[in-house]
């Protein structure tokens, strides 16, 4: 049994969710449905909110001290998923 940290990104028609999982438990959760982001989404271009989500997720990941995370590939690696992962990598999180 491997005990790795996994990044899972879930997309719905209206929102994005990003979780960091360890042994099936959520350690860090960020979504566009959170009050902080939801109020600002209407004011910005919808192409920017995956970046906002990535910056918030990287801040929370750094608070916990996680540096190496494996990506659970549930979606194709392009578009919003790629944007979130690129922002995480730019902020120093190593994604495998």
Swiss-Prot record:
Q: Gene3D superfamilies under this entry?
A: 3.30.420.100
Ranked from the top, the taxonomy reads: Eukaryota, Discoba, Jakobida, Histionina, Histionidae
Compartment(s) where it occurs, according to its Swiss-Prot or TrEMBL record = Mitochondrion
GO process terms (BP): translation
The UniProt entry, under InterPro entries, shows:
Ribosomal_uL18_bac/euk
Name this polypeptide is given = Large ribosomal subunit protein uL18m
**Family annotation (Pfam families):** Ribosomal_L18p
Record has Ribonucleoprotein as a keyword? yes
What gene name is listed for this protein?
Answer: RPL18
């Amino acid at each position: 049994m491997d005990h790795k940290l996994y990044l899972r990104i879930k997309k719905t028609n209206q929102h994005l969710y990003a979780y960091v999982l360890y042994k099936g438990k959520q350690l860090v959760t960020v979504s566009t449905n959170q009050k902080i982001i939801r109020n600002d989404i209407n004011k910005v271009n919808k192409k920017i909110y995956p970046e906002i989500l990535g910056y918030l997720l990287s801040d929370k990941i750094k608070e916990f001290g996680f540096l190496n995370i494996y990506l659970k590939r549930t979606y194709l690696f392009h578009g919003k998923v790629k944007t979130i992962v690129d922002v995480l990598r730019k902020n120093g999180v190593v994604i495998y």
